[in-house]
Amino acid sequence: MFFKGYVETNGKKCIEKFKNRNDFKTYEQVERLNSFAGILSKETVLVDIDDYEESEILFKIIKEKGLKCRVYKTTRGKHFLFKNNGLDKCRTHCFLAIGINADIKIGKVNSYSVLKVDGVEREIIYDNAENEEADLLPKYLTPVRSNMEFLNMEAGDG
């Protein structure tokens, strides 16, 4: 299960308290709202790629490998939802082992994913996670300590 419930937002900003709480709204209760978010379940990890080109590279890999996950189209890139493989904190502007820059959100620290903004629901463009049972986040999508821009390297660099 990707989300443990839903909360109302104002655009992308959450307007309901969601920490230390279990009485979240259902999808049916929020679907008519102008903006809402899903509270990530404990076992969910969200990989947020804001660069369109980089998000397309990862999307192609996921489709070719047939990975079980869910992918949302965003205004700038894509959100990829997987089962957490042991990450214990959220990260911003980190490099993944595959060389792509991403933000990472994890459910066990009360994170949310905006699903509808100003009346427009984010489109699910890929979802082959049966009953929302996704694959573990692949090792090549875990954060690494590096500031090298692998995608911009040429032969002989590094």
Predicted stretch roles:
Residues 79:
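Histidine-centered active-site/metal-ligand motif
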